[in-house]
């Protein structure tokens, strides 16, 4: 049970569920919303009651251990899975229609303003058009942020789409861009791999876990410009078989249910 719904507190007390921990963002002192307090309480209570738990990345597990949450509890590593995304991607033709796909959101950790500062700092003759995905519920707010950077004509904010159209956006991009201060997992990297696309992303732990020859990391504006040019100049290296997260997920599922 994800600790995000109305039955989570009941399940925590009954002890009949496995708690899935995506990230620990709700435990940050800055989060004072009712939903954050509810999620925090459910996680802390489940930990106190020695519930089994599932973590979705090694980064999340390191944080859990560092704050001594779920101490002496049985934990399972179930990486985020993208079976449906992968199924659709396999049916898509992989094209390059000459745009960057920024997969983001409006949460503080996404640092959308910081991403747009980097984008606007690219020389105009080198700057590909940008499509922003993940802000469907806050398009007007995002447009106001864009206005501050004077690159409105080069940016399209994508509204809510069904998964088929989302996958199509990935498959038709030049590369995927994920800019964030912190993540529990970093699904954009895995989705880029499933779409056979290179990805440019901030050098944070959750993204570094998934580093390979198609992942380009940066820490500051200078790094960003270097890696931006590198990702444009390079060719995608077809090194992926089955997504490693899927292999781990299947083995852990068998372990959880005691199958040989």
Residue locations for each model-derived region?
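Carbohydrate transferase catalytic cores enriched for Leloir-type hexosyltransferases
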Residues: 1-260
């Amino acid at each position: 049970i994800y600790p995000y719904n109305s039955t989570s507190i009941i399940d925590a007390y009954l002890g009949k569920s496995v708690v899935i921990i995506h990230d620990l963002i709700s435990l940050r002192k800055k989060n004072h919303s009712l939903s954050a307090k509810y999620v925090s309480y459910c996680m802390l209570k489940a930990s106190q009651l020695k519930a089994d738990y599932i973590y979705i990345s090694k980064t999340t597990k390191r944080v859990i251990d560092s704050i001594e949450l779920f101490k002496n509890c049985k934990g399972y590593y179930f990486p985020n899975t993208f079976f449906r995304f992968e199924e659709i991607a396999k049916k898509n033709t992989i094209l390059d229609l000459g745009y960057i796909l920024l997969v983001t959101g409006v949460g503080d950790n996404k640092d959308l303003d910081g991403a747009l500062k980097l984008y606007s700092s690219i020389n105009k003759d080198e700057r590909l058009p940008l499509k922003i995905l993940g802000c469907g519920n806050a398009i007007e707010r995002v447009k106001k942020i864009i206005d501050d950077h004077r690159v409105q004509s080069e940016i399209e904010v994508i509204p809510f789409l069904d998964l088929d159209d989302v996958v199509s956006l990935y498959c038709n991009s030049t590369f995927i861009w994920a800019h964030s201060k912190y993540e529990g997992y970093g699904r954009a990297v895995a989705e880029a791999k499933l779409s056979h696309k290179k990805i440019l992303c901030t050098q944070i732990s959750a993204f570094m876990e998934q580093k390979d020859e198609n992942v380009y990391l940066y820490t500051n504006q200078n790094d960003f410009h270097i890696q931006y040019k590198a990702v444009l100049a390079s060719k995608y290296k077809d090194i992926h078989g089955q997504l490693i997260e899927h292999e781990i997920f299947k083995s852990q599922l068998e372990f959880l249910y005691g199958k040989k």
